């Protein structure tokens, strides 16, 4: 059976469209509250990966009571302990959503959610920035 280039292109385009529709459908399942949580969580993640306690605390205030452990933290260690609690919620919230990846650091045995496929370890900070792997 021979398939013309035009039919093959049409099938490929239709397949891509279906994948995109499915991806957008998953993202649409997030409530506004979940989207806000994940946005603030990502800000905290980026700040902790950069060892920036002040920015992590500022982003945590956007989460109200959920972010209070980080907002009140006096050290990066304390902020990272609070972040671990948020990561459990982030994993549940982001499960099955397009654009979110669960990462794991085997050295610290910690998980987190991030939007990039390039590892940015919030638990190890600048000293361990690339330690971890995206979970499949």
Regions found by a protein language model. Name each.
Residues 18-136:
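Intrinsically disordered, low-complexity terminal tails/loops enriched in metal-binding residues
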Residues 2-13:
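Bacterial N-terminal signal peptides that target proteins for export
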Residues 1-2, 58:
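Intrinsic low-complexity, intrinsically disordered segments enriched in polar/basic residues
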């Amino acid at each position: 059976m021979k398939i013309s280039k035009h039919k093959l292109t049409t099938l490929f385009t239709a397949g891509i469209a279906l994948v995109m529709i499915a991806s957008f459908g998953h993202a649409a399942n997030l409530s506004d509250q979940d989207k806000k949580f994940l946005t603030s969580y990502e800000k905290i993640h980026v700040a902790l990966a950069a060892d920036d306690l002040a920015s992590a605390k500022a982003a945590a205030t956007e989460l109200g009571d959920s972010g209070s452990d980080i907002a009140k933290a006096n050290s990066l260690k304390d902020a990272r302990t609070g972040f671990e609690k948020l990561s459990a919620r982030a994993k549940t919230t982001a499960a099955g959503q397009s654009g979110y990846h669960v990462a794991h650091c085997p050295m610290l045995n910690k998980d987190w959610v991030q939007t990039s496929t390039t590892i940015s370890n919030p638990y190890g900070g600048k000293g361990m920035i690339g330690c971890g792997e995206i979970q499949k």
